[in-house]
Amino acid sequence: MAQAKKKSTAKKKTTSKKRTNSRKKKNDNPIRYVIAILVVVLMVLGVFQLGIIGRLIDSFFNYLFGYSRYLTYILVLLATGFITYSKRIPKTRRTAGSIVLQIALLFVSQLVFHFNSGIKAEREPVLSYVYQSYQHSHFPNFGGGVLGFYLLELSVPLISLFGVCIITILLLCSSVILLTNHQHRDVAKVALENIKAWFGSFNEKMSERNQEKQLKREEKARLKEEQKARQNEQPQIKDVSDFTEVPQERDIPIYGHTENESKSQSQPSRKKRVFDAENSSNNIVNHHQADQQEQLIEQTHNSVESENTIEEAGEVTNVSYVVPPLTLLNQPAKQKATSKAEVQRKGQVLENTLKDFGVNAKVTQIKIGPAVTQYEIQPAQGVKVSKIVNLHNDIALALAAKDVRIEAPIPGRSAVGIEVPNEKISLVSLKEVLDEKFPSNNKLEVGLGRDISGDPITVPLNEMPHLLVAGSTGSGKSVCINGIITSILLNAKPHEVKLMLIDPKMVELNVYNGIPHLLIPVVTNPHKAAQALEKIVAEMERRYDLFQHSSTRNIKGYNELIRKQNQELDEKQPELPYIVVIVDELADLMMVAGKEVENAIQRITQMARAAGIHLIVATQRPSVDVITGIIKNNIPSRIAFAVSSQTDSRTIIGTGGAEKLLGKGDMLYVGNGDSSQTRIQGAFLSDQEVQDVVNYVVEQQQANYVKEMEPDAPVDKSEMKSEDALYDEAYLFVVEQQKASTSLLQRQFRIGYNRASRLMDDLERNQVIGPQKGSKPRQVLIDLNNDEV
């Protein structure tokens, strides 16, 4: 029985397979493909009108559909392909869109034919008419064909010709929506929102225009009233309101630094300075925390009793110490002022030159500075600023100037500044710069010079908080450093501000040896300089320890807490002094101990502001291997003196401009957070004035150096020792070859890698070779002609 069942099931399976195969054979009837190929061939013949059959097919479609027959060809081909492969009629949104598009094109073709042919289009295209048309022309124009004719004839009486046009546009839009497979509701919603937004913006623009027109009317009325008042007061003044023509006799307001000098001598200046600011945030100690902070400050001082700090090693506050008076500085000699008539003449020449080149502008103001004269140009509406900047050389030629610097635009002003060098640079002395401000409450206030307007410029170091000074040799960099140091000596006592001076050139800052403000003697050895900077880093970390234990955030809050503690407990705990570190030539330090110096500068510039430690770095080689990206990013304030190329200027201040400076103290200053440069003529300070101030300070108090801050003495070459017996031979080999590497020692002495590495470490520790700098070869620091070799 089981075998019989198996045989019956096997028979059923075979019969079902035969049925499916027979169905497939029926479905895969080749007649369908033959018909599809035939339709495609006929459509191609009709489209290209190939032979008698092609012309007959095209004539038939032309009679039915007119100019819209080309879309009909495409739709027939697409439908044939779809039906052949899918074996069903397409029923999609795109199919409906194609049909709607065909109807819309019938309307469009017939409307175009109606407007172009007139009465001819109104004739019914019966077969006799069609036959006559083909006798006169191979391809007569039937517009939308028979279908288009009857569609238009039926629609015009119902909805008029204008209504047919609207219906046609709607059909075209609907076909596009269907073909792109979108919903009419969504498209309508987006369209309405866009229309609303457009109307809203249009209303806003119209209201703004009305307000502007109203303001212009009020402004014109006000100007007319002012003009009438001026004419009543001064009837002899000519009207120069015409912007295109510049009268030669027009007086331009002139401001000069010579007038400022006379004003400053007669009365104190009430003008607020550009860079003066009050730093009053995060420094006030709350009264209800006084008891807790007293205990914290006692614990802090007890915890650091075993260490010799700057306060303990330094001097006791000298009550009798008096800051040097400004009378020690020389009074500036009277100099020949720049002729105002000559400046007026150049202003008229500048206007005429711009006018000759098609630039409509006028000189609204002239500022005579110590080194340059700035002509403030106000261009007319529609004049591009770049057009004025591109006339740089032509302006210099017309004014017979050595060079011209264009500031376009002047920050905060709707004007362009053209800076022309004076025939003679006026000397700016440090005394006239400090006369109005000193003595200052800010002990780190330093004088820089005078700006283009002739106003004295002083800046607080604690707001910089670090400064980069760079420029070529002889541009005034060392004078600027001397002016900064002298400003500190004239304003701060030794217990208020401490100095650390690093001078690898050995001649610039040696005059300050012995002043009580110094932490250590002036450092001239580059190796000691790197160690001195590391000592400053250690002092910074110690101060942050104090701030942490006393719950204060910076040096100002800590000193306020100490003063309050001294008043309440009648004690004399020393306050933390500000420390200013000045490096006069960074390039020499980077060449000898670049890695250590860069790391120390990075730590100081990143963290030392709150600790009251400020760094001033000067160099005469503003290249990227000296002013590295790390140093540049961490020093926000920069002073650029005259340099030789725009590349050097970009290295210092990030933009060009320093290459057009005149030298002799002419500088560009970029403050912390400022996006624009300020041109300043640096204050001059003679060597005798520096010596007089130093003598006055030293006579009152001698220097009391902090031994803990002094760098370690360099290793004596005669005492260099190494446990390796090959050290002497390796030493001589490296000095002779003037190159050193671990692989070189391995090959020369046939030793392993570990021993060669230890020899390299010994040579570096004994200052025979420099530190490793990535893939670059190590520098040999000892010459073959050295006596020690």
Curated annotation (Swiss-Prot):
<dbReference type="InterPro" id="IPR027417">
    <property type="entry name" value="P-loop_NTPase"/>
</dbReference>
<dbReference type="Pfam" id="PF09397">
    <property type="entry name" value="FtsK_gamma"/>
</dbReference>
<keyword id="KW-0472">Membrane</keyword>
<feature type="topological domain" description="Cytoplasmic">
    <location>
        <begin position="179"/>
        <end position="789"/>
    </location>
</feature>
<feature type="domain" description="FtsK">
    <location>
        <begin position="454"/>
        <end position="650"/>
    </location>
</feature>
<keyword id="KW-1133">Transmembrane helix</keyword>
<keyword id="KW-0547">Nucleotide-binding</keyword>
<dbReference type="InterPro" id="IPR002543">
    <property type="entry name" value="FtsK_dom"/>
</dbReference>
<keyword id="KW-0812">Transmembrane</keyword>
<dbReference type="GO" id="GO:0007059">
    <property type="term" value="P:chromosome segregation"/>
</dbReference>
<feature type="region of interest" description="Disordered">
    <location>
        <begin position="209"/>
        <end position="275"/>
    </location>
</feature>
<keyword id="KW-0132">Cell division</keyword>
<feature type="transmembrane region" description="Helical">
    <location>
        <begin position="137"/>
        <end position="157"/>
    </location>
</feature>
<feature type="region of interest" description="Disordered">
    <location>
        <begin position="1"/>
        <end position="25"/>
    </location>
</feature>
<keyword id="KW-0131">Cell cycle</keyword>
<dbReference type="InterPro" id="IPR041027">
    <property type="entry name" value="FtsK_alpha"/>
</dbReference>
<dbReference type="Pfam" id="PF01580">
    <property type="entry name" value="FtsK_SpoIIIE"/>
</dbReference>
<feature type="transmembrane region" description="Helical">
    <location>
        <begin position="99"/>
        <end position="119"/>
    </location>
</feature>
<dbReference type="InterPro" id="IPR050206">
    <property type="entry name" value="FtsK/SpoIIIE/SftA"/>
</dbReference>
<keyword id="KW-1003">Cell membrane</keyword>
<dbReference type="InterPro" id="IPR003593">
    <property type="entry name" value="AAA+_ATPase"/>
</dbReference>
<dbReference type="GO" id="GO:0003677">
    <property type="term" value="F:DNA binding"/>
</dbReference>
<keyword id="KW-0067">ATP-binding</keyword>
<dbReference type="GO" id="GO:0005886">
    <property type="term" value="C:plasma membrane"/>
</dbReference>
<dbReference type="GO" id="GO:0016887">
    <property type="term" value="F:ATP hydrolysis activity"/>
</dbReference>
<feature type="compositionally biased region" description="Basic and acidic residues">
    <location>
        <begin position="247"/>
        <end position="262"/>
    </location>
</feature>
<dbReference type="GO" id="GO:0005524">
    <property type="term" value="F:ATP binding"/>
</dbReference>
<comment type="function">
    <text>Essential cell division protein that coordinates cell division and chromosome segregation. The N-terminus is involved in assembly of the cell-division machinery. The C-terminus functions as a DNA motor that moves dsDNA in an ATP-dependent manner towards the dif recombination site, which is located within the replication terminus region. Required for activation of the Xer recombinase, allowing activation of chromosome unlinking by recombination.</text>
</comment>
<feature type="transmembrane region" description="Helical">
    <location>
        <begin position="34"/>
        <end position="54"/>
    </location>
</feature>
<keyword id="KW-0238">DNA-binding</keyword>
<comment type="similarity">
    <text>Belongs to the FtsK/SpoIIIE/SftA family.</text>
</comment>
<feature type="transmembrane region" description="Helical">
    <location>
        <begin position="158"/>
        <end position="178"/>
    </location>
</feature>
<dbReference type="InterPro" id="IPR036388">
    <property type="entry name" value="WH-like_DNA-bd_sf"/>
</dbReference>
<dbReference type="Pfam" id="PF17854">
    <property type="entry name" value="FtsK_alpha"/>
</dbReference>
<protein>
    <recommendedName>
        <fullName>DNA translocase FtsK</fullName>
    </recommendedName>
</protein>
<keyword id="KW-0159">Chromosome partition</keyword>
<feature type="binding site">
    <location>
        <begin position="474"/>
        <end position="479"/>
    </location>
    <ligand>
        <name>ATP</name>
    </ligand>
</feature>
<dbReference type="InterPro" id="IPR018541">
    <property type="entry name" value="Ftsk_gamma"/>
</dbReference>
<feature type="transmembrane region" description="Helical">
    <location>
        <begin position="63"/>
        <end position="83"/>
    </location>
</feature>
<dbReference type="GO" id="GO:0051301">
    <property type="term" value="P:cell division"/>
</dbReference>
<dbReference type="InterPro" id="IPR036390">
    <property type="entry name" value="WH_DNA-bd_sf"/>
</dbReference>
<feature type="compositionally biased region" description="Basic and acidic residues">
    <location>
        <begin position="209"/>
        <end position="231"/>
    </location>
</feature>
